[in-house]
């Protein structure tokens, strides 16, 4: 039961943090590129890598990794925004968003793990 509470607590704070950062960034973004989701997902990839790489206990992994990072990052919004770019026939931004998210995300997860200690 404690494990579920850790995940739920982390998820609550992760979702609230994503909501606040996303709204703040969207108000300042003047381009077609979905910068809010991109930065949130890249930051989340790095932080999750760091959390796992640092070898924290299972409880902290559940709270911060599964809970907070699971709710903070957003795969579904990334896919929705990708489809919206395609529907608007904004192919160059679509390709940039797709490739940058995967390439930079994997790189940042790797860097996080390395800095975390693995």
UniProtKB/Swiss-Prot annotation:
What Pfam families has UniProt attached to this entry?
CRCB
- The principal location of this protein is membrane
Membrane topology recorded in Swiss-Prot or TrEMBL: Multi-pass membrane protein
Q: Which UniProt keywords apply?
A: Cell membrane, Ion channel, Ion transport, Membrane, Metal-binding, Sodium, Transmembrane, Transmembrane helix, Transport
Stated regulation of activity:
Na(+) is not transported, but it plays an essential structural role and its presence is essential for fluoride channel function.
**What domain of life?**
Bacteria
The Gene Ontology biological process terms listed for this entry are: cellular detoxification of fluoride
Free-text function comment from the UniProt entry: Fluoride-specific ion channel. Important for reducing fluoride concentration in the cell, thus reducing its toxicity.
Q: Write the protein's name.
A: Fluoride-specific ion channel FluC 2
